[in-house]
């Protein structure tokens, strides 16, 4: 018989708003929660006995998989993966896209990215971990040739699972993907794995603002996503990143797109230090792109993260002559707060900023609740005050 867990008003309210991760703190009968095995199916009820959802117990939380009383078995996993894939195909995605985006696709704690015939898998739900073989079998049935697992980081630890990186099926470890007119080499080797698919729409949008001969600074450029799109439109690009391996791949991506070597330069270094040096040297760029890693993965880290974002954007605004493209993938930082801090940072840099466009994550990362929206991307016109 499935264990019944009752939640307080905070837990009830969270589920009503579409948040399907319920911390142990919101569970009233904690003794029952503690007594069952990790990975077991549990039913969530309100204090008054209203059924709210069904999911898997994890060490510190329950990850709700469904709001119905249905079996969370192998067929459930298989059907939801197939349905999630069909949804992307209906949206027009073909070869490269996020196939499964955790709770948005009723597979809470599972992320699958597809790169042609290679898929990467991330699992941070103990219940899904127990059915990993089904995930692999389903992907193979859908025509995937090779599967690479990259289950690591904070969410993996919360699930009480060891970090795992390696091939689950097949032998391929690299492929070439197409994004608009741009091509990118994507590798799967345990260090810099995959490609940030969530920025697809924003990278394509960037091309509309680039003019022939523009000087572009791409901060935290990774493997050159924004850089390549800018270069394709005739820009001269300077990319900055801490990872030597990522920058090597960025250079390969420039070569792959037949960009002359005198039109790009990649600098290995700390973004803040490099930008400070550029400011001291009086450097200016027509376009500055800021796409840093998440500064805050929890609300506790938000205060220091805001300071970091403010400094980064202040430096970026000082260096930008015409356009500032700035991003944040910190989920706890809300869109309005991000807009406000960017505008303030521009003012502190003596720049008058006008928001041209606000972008979010690509639609293959569907937003179904506040908790599933994380990416923010602002396009701003900037001019001297």
From Swiss-Prot:
CDD domains: AdoMet_MTases, PUA_RlmI, RlmI_M_like. GO terms for biological process: methylation; rRNA processing. Pfam families: Methyltrans_SAM, PUA_3. The keyword Cytoplasm applies. It is found in: Cytoplasm. One of its GO terms (molecular function) is RNA binding. Residues 2-81 form the PUA domain. Gene3D superfamilies: PUA domain, RNA methyltransferase domain (HRMD) like, Vaccinia Virus protein VP39. Signal peptide: none annotated. Keywords: Cytoplasm, Methyltransferase, RNA-binding, rRNA processing, S-adenosyl-L-methionine, Transferase. The lineage of its organism: Archaea, Methanobacteriati, Methanobacteriota, Methanomada group, Methanococci. Belongs to the methyltransferase superfamily. RlmI family. Its EC number is 2.1.1.-. It comes from Methanocaldococcus jannaschii (strain ATCC 43067 / DSM 2661 / JAL-1 / JCM 10045 / NBRC 100440) (Methanococcus jannaschii). This is Putative ribosomal RNA large subunit methyltransferase MJ1653. It is an enzyme of class 2 (transferase). GO terms for cellular component: cytoplasm. Its main location: cytoplasm.
């Amino acid at each position: 018989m499935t264990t019944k867990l009752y939640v307080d008003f905070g837990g009830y309210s969270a589920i009503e708003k579409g948040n399907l991760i319920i911390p142990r703190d919101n569970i009233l009968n904690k003794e029952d929660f503690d007594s069952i095995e990790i990975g077991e199916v549990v039913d969530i009820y309100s204090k008054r006995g209203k059924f709210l959802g069904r999911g898997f117990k994890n060490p510190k939380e329950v990850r709700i998989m469904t709001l119905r009383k249905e079996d969370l078995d192998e067929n459930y996993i298989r059907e939801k993966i197939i349905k999630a894939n069909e949804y992307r195909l209906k949206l027009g995605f073909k070869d490269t896209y996020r196939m499964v985006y955790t709770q948005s696709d009723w597979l809470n704690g599972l992320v699958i990215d597809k790169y042609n015939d290679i898929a990467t898998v991330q699992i941070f739900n103990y219940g899904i971990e127990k059915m990993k073989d089904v995930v692999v079998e389903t992907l193979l049935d859908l025509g995937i040739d090779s599967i690479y697992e990259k289950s690591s980081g904070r969410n993996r630890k919360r699930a009480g699972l060891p970090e795992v990186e390696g091939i689950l099926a097949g032998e391929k470890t690299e492929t070439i993907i197409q994004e608009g007119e741009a091509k990118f080499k994507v590798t799967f080797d345990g260090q810099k794995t995959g490609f940030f698919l969530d920025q697809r729409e924003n990278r394509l949008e960037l091309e509309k603002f680039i003019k022939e001969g523009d000087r572009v600074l791409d901060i935290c450029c990774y493997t050159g996503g924004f850089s390549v799109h800018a270069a394709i439109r005739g820009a001269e690009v300077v990319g900055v990143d801490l990872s030597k391996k990522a920058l090597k791949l960025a250079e390969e991506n420039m070569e792959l797109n037949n960009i002359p070597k005198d039109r790009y330069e990649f600098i290995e270094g700390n973004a803040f230090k490099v930008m400070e040096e550029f400011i001291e040297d009086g450097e200016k760029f027509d376009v500055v792109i800021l796409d840093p890693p998440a500064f805050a993965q929890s609300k506790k880290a938000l205060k220091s993260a805001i300071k970091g974002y403010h400094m980064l954007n202040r430096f970026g605004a000082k260096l930008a002559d015409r356009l500032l493209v700035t991003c944040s993938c910190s989920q706890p930082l809300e869109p309005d707060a991000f807009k406000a801090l960017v505008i303030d940072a521009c003012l502190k840099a003596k720049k008058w900023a006008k928001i041209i466009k606000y972008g979010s994550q690509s639609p293959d990362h569907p937003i179904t609740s506040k908790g599933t929206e994380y990416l923010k991307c602002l396009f701003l016109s900037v001019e001297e005050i």
